[in-house]
Amino acid sequence: MPSAPIYVLLGTIGSGKTLQAQNLEHVVGGQSFSIGSLIRQRLSDDPRMARGELLPDEEVNSIVVETIKHVPENEPIIFDGFPRVASQKEWLDAQGEQLGRHIKQVFYLRVDEDEVNRRLSLRGRADDTPGAIEQRKRVFHDETLPVIEAYRAAGVLVEIDGNKTPEEVEQLLVEAVET
């Protein structure tokens, strides 16, 4: 039996990952999971959230396992914002093999800094404090960009211009999945 696909959406804070992951559900089926949203729901009072810190891999991986264990084995999974660091990528690769899944495509929603700042000024999420925003941007540049480059080297990365309207970005995703 062929393995079920995993799709990944990565991008900096405010790049539209969650919306596009939900849109991707309509194209490939399956279920999307915003790991950041799940973490915020479970740890809303945790001071690490207000500081924009990454949680230890063990905590994040535990949330991922708990979340996906109910997904039927033949159904695609769409991760939004995960894996964020190299160790999480390695864990997901190994976990995928154990679960009979494979990374089919990784979409990098590339958004310019000015556009990110504009979007964040409109978003108004409780954990979007100036300090937390800067910390998450640093983590993206220092930790997530190398993950993106690893997926590029593996031949599964699709770079999407995330500066466009949500509808245009969705269309680019649809076209990329269908090719």
What role is predicted for each listed range?
Residues 1-179:
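Glycine-rich phosphate-binding loop of ATP-dependent small-molecule kinases
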